[in-house]
Structures are given as C-alpha cells and as structure tokens.
Regions:
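Ubiquitin-like/PB1-type beta-grasp interaction modules and other compact soluble beta-rich domains
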Residues: 1-80
Length: 80
C-alpha cells in the first residue's frame, strides 16, 4: 500500500489530503483513487503531475510499501 498525498484541487475533489491505497504500480493506485473519489477527481487527475518519493515517474513504475505518491495539480500565481 502506498501513501497518497493530494494537493490543491486534487485534495478538494477527493475530500482529503492523504490516504493509503493499495496497488503495485502508480497506475493501479491512481485507478483505485479514481474509483474511490469519483468523476470529479478523475477530471482533476487528468491535469496533474504524479511524483513518487519526490521524483517524476512513469505510470508503470512499481511501488513499494513505504512509497509516497504525490498528486500535484498545476500551479500558477506569483507577482509580475
């Protein structure tokens, strides 16, 4: 099981900032998250980057029991 951290609009869509979700790969964990959190989360997920332990990874990347999956929506802002 991987610890999943959700930020900004992903957190809002899921209704939580973190969860523990079973899956052997990033893709399996994300599919399980979509099933758990519903269509609004699925829509937001399509705009997000997914990192594992601070690294950008492919969907087929294997996950271990202590891995942390971060779902990061695009950010903007700052000063001009």
């Amino acid at each position: 099981m991987a610890r999943v951290r959700l930020f900004a609009s992903a957190r809002d869509a899921a209704g939580t900032g973190s969860d523990v979700i079973a899956g052997d790969t990033v893709a399996e964990v994300l599919r399980a998250a979509e099933d758990r959190y519903g269509p609004r989360f699925t829509e937001v997920l399509g705009t997000c980057r997914v990192w594992v332990n601070g690294n950008d990874v492919a969907p087929d990347a294997a996950l271990g029991p202590d891995d942390e999956v971060a779902v990061l929506p695009p950010v903007s802002g700052g000063t001009t």
